[in-house]
């Protein structure tokens, strides 16, 4: 039996209520992370394999590394856009852990993130971190699996050639087959159910707000599927934007129409996410995994690419896409639906799957499709779970989590009070230190006013006479800031 440790927010079989998902951030800030980690979990469950979730945070202590070396035969690390400046600290923590491991380490689906122009210049400063990570991984595996050609070229420029382009494991949830994506001959109508997904960084690249507003006005049955932890917190806790009479242009506050009308959801598990999306006619937006979830459920989708992480995957898998920066503000979802062509996606899927399986074979990993039941037991177990529904807009009533909300608010009040006490203590200590320094300054002035100072003339004397008052002024300013 082979025991595999996988980096993931949680096991697919672990059922967590909304408050736990938010409190522990089990989605790792983005529900898309669970989509590809759940897919990898299923793929790895061969007949002679067990798979255990390590969680999303990285404990790189020597104790944890020793535990992993003792208990597991391999560490599988599914990643997304890890080669980006904001992820550098997390990447370094992963490197520190991997450098202590004596078992194989297999990285799946890692990517570089830059603009749609593929200019990797912004990644220059983090090259040492990327090199360290790559060296640590490749000492423990035959190759590293990347999202697309951009990432492969970037790593080759850094001197790494043991790289396989495999895309994202989420697209192989169903193995070498892919769901049919049938479009209605009449296109989208006013009665069509349309799902939209948004990443707010994309609004700086193209007319995302305007396109969202047009879709909201055009389709009464429009639903916004958000993915990030702050989105879940907004739905779970609410805010004061309605009372403040705010008029947000994007659904970042409760005052937006999509939230006022309870047309926003945050999925907690990939399988409820896909189940929800299976009832829609079309999905579009700037979230790559939001649209992959739709495709996996059999719902046609179109990605509005705003950076390399989305564009790279769309190009590799032939997912229908448009560059957001090239779209006019009056773009209609019906136009995107009409342009969506899934023939290349379907025609090339088996070849891409075979390439993915070859990567796994090269790295000594069995898979459920070649060495198991094709995921049948996994799917049966998932179907038997009572997974919580996607989070909706909280109306202030008793949804079963009122006790948690009260307890959490009490904790935050207590933590805030303790922080104030700690700050006051630091201020008192600083004030005492300032008084001590002022006393030393006075002693210095007395010394300077003695007979030795009389022998000092000219510029040196003026400098020394001004020294005491200048120091006192600096101390007073420091004391006032505290």
Segment roles from a protein language model:
Residues 482:
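A C-terminal cap/extension of S-adenosyl-L-methionine-dependent methyltransferases
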């Amino acid at each position: 039996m082979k025991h595999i440790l996988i980096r993931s927010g949680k096991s697919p079989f672990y059922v967590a209520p909304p408050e736990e998902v938010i409190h522990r951030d089990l989605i790792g800030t983005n529900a898309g992370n669970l989509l590809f980690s759940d897919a990898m979990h299923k793929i790895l469950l061969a007949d002679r394999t067990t798979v255990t979730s390590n969680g999303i945070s990285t404990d790189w202590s020597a104790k944890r590394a020793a535990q992993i070396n003792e208990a597991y035969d391999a560490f599988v690390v599914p990643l997304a856009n890890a080669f980006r400046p904001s992820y550098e600290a997390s990447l370094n923590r992963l490197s520190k852990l991997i450098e202590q491991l004596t078992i194989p380490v297999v990285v799946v689906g890692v990517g570089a993130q830059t603009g749609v122009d593929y200019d990797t210049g912004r990644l220059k400063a983090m090259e040492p971190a990327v090199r360290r990570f790559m060296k640590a991984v490749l000492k423990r595996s035959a190759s590293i699996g990347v999202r697309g050609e951009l990432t492969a070229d970037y790593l080759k420029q850094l001197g790494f050639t043991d790289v396989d382009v495999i895309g994202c494991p989420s697209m192989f949830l169903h193995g070498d087959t892919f769901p049919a994506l049938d479009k209605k001959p009449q296109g989208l109508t006013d009665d069509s159910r349309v799902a939209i997904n948004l990443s707010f960084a994309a609004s700086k690249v193209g007319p995302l707000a305007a396109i969202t507003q047009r879709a909201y006005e055009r389709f009464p049955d429009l639903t916004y599927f958000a993915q990030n932890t702050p989105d879940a917190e907004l739905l779970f806790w609410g805010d004061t934007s309605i009372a403040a009479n705010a008029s947000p242009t994007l659904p970042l506050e409760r005052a937006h129409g999509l939230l006022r009308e309870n047309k926003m959801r945050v999925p907690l598990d990939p399988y409820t996410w896909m189940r929800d999306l299976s009832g829609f006619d079309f999905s579009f937006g700037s979230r790559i995994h939001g649209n992959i979830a739709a495709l996996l459920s059999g719902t046609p989708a179109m990605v509005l690419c705003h950076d390399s992480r989305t564009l790279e995957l769309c190009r590799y898998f032939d997912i229908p896409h448009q560059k957001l920066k090239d779209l006019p503000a009056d773009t209609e979802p019906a136009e995107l639906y009409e342009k969506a062509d899934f023939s290349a996606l379907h025609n090339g899927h088996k070849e891409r799957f075979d390439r993915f399986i070859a990567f796994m074979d090269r790295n000594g990993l069995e898979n459920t499709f070649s060495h198991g039941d094709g995921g049948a037991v996994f799917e049966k177990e998932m179907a038997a779970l009572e997974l919580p529904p996607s989070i909706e807009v909280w109306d202030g009533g008793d949804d079963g989590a009122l006790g948690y909300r009260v307890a959490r608010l009490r904790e935050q009040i207590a933590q805030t009070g303790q922080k104030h006490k700690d700050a006051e203590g630091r201020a008192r200590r600083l004030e005492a230190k300032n008084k001590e320094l002022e006393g030393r300054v006075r002693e210095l002035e007395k010394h300077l006013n003695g007979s030795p100072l009389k022998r000092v003339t000219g510029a040196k004397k003026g400098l020394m006479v001004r020294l005491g008052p200048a120091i006192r002024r600096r101390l007073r300013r420091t004391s006032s800031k505290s």
